[in-house]
């Protein structure tokens, strides 16, 4: 009999994983403070990593990788992409971005030196001079100059400003209490018809204890309800596809898709009929490339291969597609929720791939085959 503890009661994904484990008859749930467990389904930000792997005779597995915030916090992701040898030169799939600290945090400002991309040595260095240099160059060249400011730890569409005025963006950040990222706004996204609407794509990615990377075959488009207008920055519903914003502010929420969600099968049909292309060839190939590059760049820093405990983690990668069908990474979520209709299959995949590979069911003699719902990258 294997044992597990649950330390995060708010995760709907791990509530379902917990239910599936108990249903096998091979797992027993212990009190959350019991140290003698095989599996910890923990809370993302307060995991006791230092205490894991020290129970004699017990293999211990936890559902997060220590250090994965390098990918999952917006400012850390920008720094990773600019400083990682694997990404800095070849990364063409991430919008131009700058890390800005509010002036009230008393952060040293990096001086601009004949260029836009700074070498980031001080992890708390503010990049506003580099942003302004790029902003002014674009203004002189007559390029599109819309930017978006986003709180590094923000979620659900909070702490966001879209503007074509550099001073407005910097003033907005300087009145906040935490680090922000200023990112070049995708002014010409691929739009859905009818409705001339924006969307983003959520892909779920599972990394097992051996750092094998699996992409969940199903993905979801989170769609806007209102027609897109690049010059109307005040109307968040045409710019931001977060469920919270669409549901609260758009009178057309649910008009085009139930819950403003479109799944890959329907999206593929749309691409085939509207653009004569397929999802796999035009978009998924790019998505797979970006996911691999991101996760492999942090592997040396977060892998548990030589630690006394083991990890796995589910990530949510969010993408946008521009009108040239180029895919852009927007952000990575380290504790993603899941569309309601996908819970059963996604969570069964977590059990089969990430948990049963470490703790095989005692009545299974043959090695388990990879679930068809996941693609190994």
From Swiss-Prot:
EC numbers, comma separated: 6.3.2.25
Gene Ontology terms: cellular component: spindle microtubule
Reaction(s) catalysed (UniProt annotation): C-terminal L-alpha-aminoacyl-L-glutamyl-L-glutamyl-[tubulin] + L-tyrosine + ATP = C-terminal L-alpha-aminoacyl-L-glutamyl-L-glutamyl-L-tyrosyl-[tubulin] + ADP + phosphate + H(+)
GO biological process: microtubule cytoskeleton organization; positive regulation of mitotic cell cycle; post-translational protein modification; regulation of axon extension; regulation of metaphase plate congression
Family matches, as PROSITE patterns: TTL (PS51221)
Keywords of the record: ATP-binding, Ligase, Magnesium, Nucleotide-binding, Potassium
InterPro entries xrefs: TTL/TTLL_fam, Tubulin-tyrosine_ligase
Domain TTL: 3-370
GO molecular function, one term: ATP binding
Pfam family, one: TTL
First-tier enzyme category under EC: ligase
CC cofactor: Mg(2+); K(+)
Family of this protein: Belongs to the tubulin--tyrosine ligase family.
Subunit annotation: Monomer.
Function: Catalyzes the post-translational addition of a tyrosine to the C-terminal end of detyrosinated alpha-tubulin.
Protein name, entry field: Tubulin--tyrosine ligase
Species in which this protein is naturally found: Homo sapiens (Human)
Gene behind the chain: TTL
């Amino acid at each position: 009999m294997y044992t597990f503890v649950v330390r995060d009661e708010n995760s709907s994904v791990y509530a379902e994983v917990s239910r599936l484990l108990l249903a096998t008859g091979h797992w027993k749930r212990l009190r959350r403070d019991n140290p003698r467990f095989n599996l910890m389904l923990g809370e993302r930000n307060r995991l006791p990593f230092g205490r894991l792997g020290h129970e004699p005779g017990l293999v211990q597995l936890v559902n997060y990788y220590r250090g994965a915030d390098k990918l999952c916090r917006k400012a850390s992701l920008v720094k990773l992409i600019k400083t990682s040898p694997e990404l800095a030169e070849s990364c063409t799939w991430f919008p131009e971005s700058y890390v800005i600290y509010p002036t009230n945090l008393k952060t040293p400002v990096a001086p601009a030196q004949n260029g836009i991309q700074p070498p980031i040595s001080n992890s708390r260095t503010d990049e506003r001079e580099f942003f302004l240099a790029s902003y002014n160059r674009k203004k002189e060249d007559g390029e599109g100059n819309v930017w978006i400011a986003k709180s590094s730890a923000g979620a659900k569409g909070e702490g966001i400003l879209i503007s074509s005025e550099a001073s407005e963006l910097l003033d907005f950040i300087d009145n906040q209490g935490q680090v922000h990222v200023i990112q070049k706004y995708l002014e010409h996204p691929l739009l859905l018809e009818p409705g001339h609407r924006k969307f983003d794509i959520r892909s779920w990615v599972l990394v097992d204890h051996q750092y094998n990377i699996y992409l969940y075959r199903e993905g979801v488009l989170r769609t806007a309800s209102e027609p897109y207008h690049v010059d109307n920055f005040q109307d968040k519903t045409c710019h931001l596809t977060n469920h919270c914003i669409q549901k609260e502010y758009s009178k057309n929420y649910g008009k085009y898709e139930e819950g403003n969600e479109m799944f890959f099968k329907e999206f593929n049909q749309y691409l085939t009929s509207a653009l004569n292309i397929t999802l796999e060839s035009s978009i998924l190939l790019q998505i797979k490339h970006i996911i691999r590059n991101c996760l492999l760049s942090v592997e040396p820093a977060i892998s548990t291969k030589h630690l006394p405990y083991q990890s796995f983690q589910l990530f949510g990668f969010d993408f946008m597609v521009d009108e040239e069908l180029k895919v852009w990474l927007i952000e990575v979520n380290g504790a993603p929720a899941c569309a309601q209709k996908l819970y059963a299959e996604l969570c069964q995949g977590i059990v089969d791939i990430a948990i049963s590979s470490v703790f095989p069911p005692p009545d299974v003699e043959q090695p388990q085959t990879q679930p068809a719902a996941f693609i190994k990258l």
